[in-house]
């Protein structure tokens, strides 16, 4: 017997991309904000189970620390939105998507990008969820 309110047969990955980047993961920064490499130290709006590392995926906002970049940016705690991940994820139409690297864009707590351009492609999931990122993206995949 089906569970009440189960609806159509959709997998978990059909709802949102796989969370493949745990706390501690290093990301390349794909904008011109001055940071080059960041490390995830927290995931915004992540409600996990006991003693489990918080993980993030494409389109999620994370709290990160700048590891490499301009001297005024280094060692700062910033917010970032993940725009690419190497781990393959499945879309509703059945297409599987993966990128060459794990990348993020530095944003304000409201979600406005701090840079003015984004290098490389941006996942459609991130561009739809964060409209300001989608507006400055050159390629949306």
Swiss-Prot record:
Keywords, in A-Z order: Ribonucleoprotein, Ribosomal protein, RNA-binding, rRNA-binding
Gene3D superfamilies: Ribosomal protein L14
Disulfide bonds: none
Matches recorded under CDD domains: Ribosomal_uL14 (cd00337)
Keyword Iron-sulfur belongs to the record: no
GO biological process terms held by the UniProt record: translation
Subunit field text: Part of the 50S ribosomal subunit. Forms a cluster with proteins L3 and L24e, part of which may contact the 16S rRNA in 2 intersubunit bridges.
PANTHER family the record matches: 50S/60S RIBOSOMAL PROTEIN L14/L23, LARGE RIBOSOMAL SUBUNIT PROTEIN UL14
UniProt similarity note: Belongs to the universal ribosomal protein uL14 family.
Record-given protein name: Large ribosomal subunit protein uL14
Organism this protein belongs to: Pyrococcus furiosus (strain ATCC 43587 / DSM 3638 / JCM 8422 / Vc1)
Gene name as annotated: rpl14
């Amino acid at each position: 017997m089906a569970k009440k309110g189960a609806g159509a047969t959709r997998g978990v990955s059909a709802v949102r991309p796989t969370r493949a980047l745990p706390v501690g993961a290093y990301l390349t920064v794909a904008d011109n904000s001055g940071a080059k490499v960041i490390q995830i130290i927290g995931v915004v709006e992540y409600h996990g189970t006991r003693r489990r590392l918080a993980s993030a995926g494409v389109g999620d906002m994370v709290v990160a620390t700048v590891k490499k970049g301009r001297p005024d940016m280094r060692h700062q705690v910033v917010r970032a939105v993940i725009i690419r991940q190497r781990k393959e994820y499945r879309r509703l139409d059945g297409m599987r998507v993966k990128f060459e690297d794990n990348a993020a864009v530095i944003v304000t707590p409201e979600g406005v990008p701090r840079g003015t351009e984004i290098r490389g492609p941006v996942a459609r999931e991130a561009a739809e969820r964060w409209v300001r990122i989608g507006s400055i993206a050159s390629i949306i995949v």
